[in-house]
């Protein structure tokens, strides 16, 4: 979630432009869990929804941690290193993920350890330029690939992030050094971005985050992230039976996350209606300087199609799968 994000003092429109046209930096409410031991990748491969065994040191992926009933416990970034696999997730999901791993360990030669870390996000088309100007000698190339780097005088783990709006990177820093890392990035052209601007960028990119747009009440097929978080070629893992059953039914679910063009600003939790009947609810709302009022939210399967007309708080709204293709007119 974005609980650590606050207003920066700058105008949200300026922050938005920085994230869309240049580079912006945010502090993310995430933490890490280290998994070590000789069978660490085998173990995680059997626990998470994506292919962990196929990753070499320096590579990574995103995955879902699920219950046996398919409930989403967390979105996890998996970073394979030479002697450890680092799992990055929301701070409030570290304990549930650790509990699930411990419960399924059953004698497997793996060990778990949490450690203090601050996680920063750097997004925008000039993010790479900022990093190089700040001292990073090279940038990770593949999505969720990573390596050690320096920003100014501070060591960081630098990750090419696939869960930020647009091109972006995530940096893992020691907590006592995080302010220095952030200040160095800002000194080399990154602008601080607060929640209001980031929400607009996330909604435009249809970039859902766990805790804000997704909870334990959701199934992976409802999030629009199945192709990102799931490998269809791997064997058994926790929650696999539910995924396979849904795939056998064509992936059909009763509700799914969609974008919405709104006729007026709204707030998260506001119901989506159609024909006087409830048809969903909003999860993230924003006023985009480019598009006006927009949102992400869940809609009933009868309104999955782009262009479906619904209402939010009695005001007409329209379902969107791609905001850029939908154009700038309401």
Where are these regions (language model features)?
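Acidic, proline/glycine-enriched N-terminal capping motif
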Residues: 1-73, 79, 322
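Short amphipathic beta-strand starts and helix->beta connectors
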Residues: 12-21, 64-75, 103-108, 149-159, ...
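Short hydrophobic/aromatic beta-strand micro-patches
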Residues: 34, 88, 172-174, 261-263, ...
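Acidic, low-complexity central loop/insert segments
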Residues: 24-27, 31-32, 77-208
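Short, conserved active-site entrance elements at the starts or edges of catalytic domains
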Residues: 201-224
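Glycine-rich, small/acidic residue-mixed loop/short-helix segments
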Residues: 1, 71, 218, 223-240, ...
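Short, surface-exposed ligand-recognition loops at beta-strand->loop->(often short) alpha-helix junctions
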Residues: 34-40, 122-128, 261-267
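Short, solvent-exposed amphipathic alpha-helical segments in soluble enzyme
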Residues: 47-53, 101-106, 136-137, 185-190, ...
């Amino acid at each position: 979630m974005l609980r650590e994000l606050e207003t920066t003092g700058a105008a949200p429109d300026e922050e938005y432009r920085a994230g869309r046209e240049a580079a912006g930096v945010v502090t993310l409410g995430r933490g890490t869990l280290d998994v070590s031991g000789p069978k660490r990748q085998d173990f995680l491969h059997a626990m998470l929804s994506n292919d962990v065994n196929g990753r070499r040191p320096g590579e990574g992926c995103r995955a879902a941690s699920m219950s046996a009933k398919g409930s989403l416990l967390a979105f996890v970034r998996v970073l394979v290193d030479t002697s450890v696999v680092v799992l990055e997730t929301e701070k409030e999901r570290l304990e549930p993920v650790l509990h699930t791993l411990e419960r399924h360990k059953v004698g497997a030669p793996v060990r778990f350890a949490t450690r203090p870390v601050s996680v920063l996000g750097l997004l925008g088309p000039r993010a790479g330029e900022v990093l190089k100007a700040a001292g990073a000698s090279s940038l990770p190339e593949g999505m969720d690939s990573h390596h050690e780097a320096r920003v100014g005088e501070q060591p960081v783990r630098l990750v090419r992030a696939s869960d930020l709006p647009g091109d972006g990177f995530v940096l893992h820093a020691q907590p006592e050094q995080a302010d220095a890392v952030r200040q160095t990035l800002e000194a080399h052209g990154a602008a601080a971005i607060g929640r209001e601007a980031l929400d607009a960028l996330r909604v435009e990119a249809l970039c859902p985050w766990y805790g804000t747009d997704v909870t334990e009440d959701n199934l992976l097929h409802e999030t629009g992230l199945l192709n990102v978080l799931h490998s269809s070629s791997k064997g058994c893992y926790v929650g696999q039976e539910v995924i396979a059953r849904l795939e056998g039914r064509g992936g059909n679910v009763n509700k799914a996350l969609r974008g919405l063009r709104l006729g007026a600003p709204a707030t998260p939790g506001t119901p989506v209606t159609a024909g006087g009947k409830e048809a969903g609810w909003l999860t993230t709302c924003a006023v985009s300087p480019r598009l006006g009022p927009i949102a992400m939210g869940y809609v009933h399967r009868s309104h999955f199609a782009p262009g479906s007309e619904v209402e939010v708080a009695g005001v007409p709204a329209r379902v969107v799968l791609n905001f850029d293709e939908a154009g700038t007119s309401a």
